[in-house]
Amino acid sequence: YCPDPANLEDWLATGQPGDRFLGSSTGYTGGFEARMASYGGVELIGITSPAGMPVGGTGRSWNSKEVWDYFTGLMIADIQAKGPFDGIHLALHGAMAVVGIARPEAELARLVRKVAGPDVVITVSLDLHACVDAELVAPDAADAVFGVKRFPHYDDTLMGQRAADVMIRVLQGTYNPVVATRKPGVITPSFFQATVRYPAREIMERAR
């Protein structure tokens, strides 16, 4: 139920944006950070991210353009101020909805690419419910995308680790990621997507 888009006041009421996700022990960023630390000689720098969810939680799934402009503005300013970077990891959900922007995740990756430069490795981690198409993995967007395969998402830490591994290998010149997308004619309701039971379990096993 989405009675109206979440506005900036709705987001800021639940917490101020910051870079506190750096230092997480689990999840996409936790897995990414831990794996990067295992390589040694890597400096991780956090950029500003929204805090939590807006007032109303996930029921307010649409966001106003004002929200988009505010948070992407903070992120891009951080990248410009704290860079240059060798790689950037975007830990996203993947089903963001913004008034007036058809594919927000792809647009965010493009904005980051534009300020970071063509040689910076950009990896993205996504939820199982992400909406992914060719725009996100186009040359002007992300180099590699890692989506969780399980619901509940107990493999999100693993996806962060894989993103770190690929980023390091690309930077070392030992790996060149190639990405393709395919859209099968399948739509499943979210309350039947738990991969511990059928039909989602069978679908995911066949997809492997």
Regions found by a protein language model. Name each.
Residues Y1-A77:
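N-terminal glycine-rich anion-binding loop in soluble enzyme alpha/beta folds
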Residues Y28, Q172-R208:
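Accessory alpha-helical/coil subdomains and C-terminal extensions
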Residues P17-T29, I122-C131, M159-A163, V179-G185:
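Low-complexity, flexible helical/coil segments
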Residues G31-R35, L111, V166, R206:
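Amphipathic alpha-helical segments that form well-ordered structural scaffolds
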Residues E43-G46, A138-D143, N176-R182:
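Short, compositionally biased low-complexity segments
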Residues S49-A51, I88-H93, A180-T181:
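Core alpha/beta catalytic barrel or barrel-like domain that forms the active/cofactor pocket
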Residues C2, W11, G59-W68, T72, ...:
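Active-site histidine-anchored catalytic micro-motif
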